[in-house]
């Protein structure tokens, strides 16, 4: 009777059970050393002693995907948005030097569609595999009074660990350090309220619009998953004393690069030192945005920036290339006079 009453209230308990069965195989492939317990336990568990750290510091992060979700819903493509969710969380804690250990997801929806939920969690599991993190728990909440039947929201939470003496904080970056940029895949997961306004409101384009500068339909470009930098950057951290790491997210270069600096330092960014992806030129044109506005909002083709001593530049680039990364020397750290971010040179690409 209780289930029948719950169903009358709009909550499909049976669909929830189907989701659990469907996602088991995806969760299983994220298993890693230290992960404990089984899917369905009240709490996810992790054995910290398995890491053999002398002074472990736990680093946590939580994030969502923002209005990029609206594009996934409109396009009915749900198998990569979970990668975005994982990326936004694990890249953030990587900036402190932490190795992601585990991840939990939260999905809220108006109506539980087991096939759709499986696709979302598949993406989350794909992201966890890329990050080396175990998917140890999550929640799917059906709330018909809060969401439309096709709507959902997705958020995640991750915890990582790092030796206390290897923790990266803003005080380590020094004047004269070199900035090394690692490419993004595209827009990643920030600025989509503006992106959607530019393309679909102001210019009235369709999801499948073909734009000459892009090699795929517009929606395919906009749904490219956020890159996960964990494995190549962890390899760099084994070899090099990295002074600072920035995950270039909302606020672009202007807001994020200063986050690894003390107040007396600034960064000089050499425009033209890396190829700007075509999607950014397209947005600048269609949105009639200035060059500075673009760098204040978007990653402009660089998703993560490392600050290292000049003596370590060559080795850093070598390790990144060995791990399949293109990487660019994009600037340097200098004494601050006015602005924390100074752009020099011209654009490229």
From Swiss-Prot:
It catalyses: 2-formamido-N(1)-(5-O-phospho-beta-D-ribosyl)acetamidine + ATP = 5-amino-1-(5-phospho-beta-D-ribosyl)imidazole + ADP + phosphate + H(+). InterPro entries: PurM-like_C_dom, PurM-like_C_sf, PurM-like_N, PurM-like_N_sf, PurM_cligase. Keywords: ATP-binding, Cytoplasm, Ligase, Nucleotide-binding, Purine biosynthesis. It holds the Pfam family AIRS. It is an enzyme of class 6 (ligase). Transmembrane segments: none annotated. Its EC number is 6.3.3.1. GO terms for biological process: 'de novo' IMP biosynthetic process; adenine biosynthetic process. One of its GO terms (molecular function) is ATP binding. It comes from the Bacteria. The keyword NADP does not apply. Pathway: Purine metabolism; IMP biosynthesis via de novo pathway; 5-amino-1-(5-phospho-D-ribosyl)imidazole from N(2)-formyl-N(1)-(5-phospho-D-ribosyl)glycinamide: step 2/2. GO terms for cellular component: cytosol. PANTHER family: TRIFUNCTIONAL PURINE BIOSYNTHETIC PROTEIN ADENOSINE-3 (PTHR10520:SF12), TRIFUNCTIONAL PURINE BIOSYNTHETIC PROTEIN ADENOSINE-3-RELATED (PTHR10520). Belongs to the AIR synthase family. HAMAP family: AIRS. This is Phosphoribosylformylglycinamidine cyclo-ligase. It comes from Listeria monocytogenes serotype 4b (strain CLIP80459). The lineage of its organism: Bacteria, Bacillati, Bacillota, Bacilli, Bacillales. The gene is purM.
């Amino acid at each position: 009777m209780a289930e029948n009453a719950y169903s009358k209230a709009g909550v499909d308990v049976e669909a929830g059970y189907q989701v659990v069965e469907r996602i088991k195989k995806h969760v299983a492939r994220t298993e890693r050393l230290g992960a404990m317990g089984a899917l369905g336990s009240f709490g996810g568990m992790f054995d910290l002693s398995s890491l053999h750290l002398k002074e472990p510091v736990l680093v946590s992060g939580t994030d969502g995907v923002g209005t990029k979700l609206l594009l996934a819903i409109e396009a009915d493509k749900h198998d990569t948005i979970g990668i975005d969710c994982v990326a936004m969380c694990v890249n953030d804690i990587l900036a402190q030097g932490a190795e992601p250990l585990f991840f939990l997801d939260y999905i809220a929806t108006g109506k539980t569609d087991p096939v759709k939920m499986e696709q979302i969690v598949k993406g989350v599991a794909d992201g966890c595999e890329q990050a080396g993190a175990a998917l140890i728990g999550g929640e799917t909440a059906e709330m018909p009074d809060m969401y439309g039947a096709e709507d959902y929201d997705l958020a995640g939470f991750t915890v990582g660990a790092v030796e206390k003496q290897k923790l990266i904080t803003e005080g380590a970056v020094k004047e004269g350090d070199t900035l090394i940029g690692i490419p993004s895949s595209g827009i990643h997961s920030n600025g989509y309220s503006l992106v959607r306004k530019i393309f679909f409101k102001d210019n009235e384009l369709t999801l499948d619009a073909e734009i000459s500068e892009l090699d795929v339909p517009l929606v395919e470009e906009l749904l490219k998953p956020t890159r996960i930098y964990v494995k190549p950057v962890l390899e760099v951290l084994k070899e090099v004393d990295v002074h600072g790491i920035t995950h270039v997210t909302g606020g672009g270069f202007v807001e994020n690069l200063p986050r690894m600096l003390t107040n007396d330092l600034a960064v000089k960014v050499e425009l033209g030192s890396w190829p700007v992806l075509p999607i950014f030129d397209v947005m600048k044109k269609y949105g009639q945005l200035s060059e500075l506005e673009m760098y204040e909002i978007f990653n402009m083709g660089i998703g993560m920036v490392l600050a290292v001593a000049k003596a370590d530049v060559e080795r850093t680039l070598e390790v990144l290339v060995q791990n399949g990364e293109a990487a660019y020397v994009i600037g340097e750290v200098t004494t601050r006079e006015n602005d924390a971010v100074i752009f020099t040179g011209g654009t490229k690409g």
